[in-house]
Amino acid sequence: MDVIDPHSVNISYPASFSVDYIRPEVVLEIGPLAAWVPSASHRIRPYAAEEFPQLFAEPECRVIATSAERTFWEKATILHQQAHRTGPMPLRYSRHYYDLYKLAASPVSTSAIADLGLLRDVVAFKQRFYPSGWARYEDAVPGSLKLIPANAHLAELQRDYNSMQVMIHGQIPDFDEIIIALRHLEDQINGLVE
């Protein structure tokens, strides 16, 4: 259990290499402040099962996870919150920009954008459990959603993104490419004024 947050479980593991940006631990947020609706059951297969199949009697298992559409709106509202931040950007937040960039380039984007009720649910959840006047969650709706922070924060985000690239498998998109795609997504969502 996390000593500061009793609703989080920290699982530490031995690191096989040393990179300051990557902490050798996984944090599971399991308390009442985590929303599980909607969710689905998914079959997963770890990379280790591909490399060492002889070590796995059953290389696949099922996990229940929050839907990708909810994750899309969770990430969008995190970016909306950060777009209204007046102080310095927190560390390790560029991952949320990368995540939404990847989700926006997938079929998940179409189904998430078609479900504005889910956006309203995510906003209501954040207003109740993560209240913040400066986040302006009430404006996280088509017509006023902001995904891109002020220019002053973009340099901070780019530095953070440059540090986090060791976490990305495969092709690493340029930071400017991510921002351009997110500006397009912001325009697309804001064009859906209800």
Segments and roles (model prediction):
Residues 1-194:
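Structured mid-to-C-terminal alpha-helical surface segments
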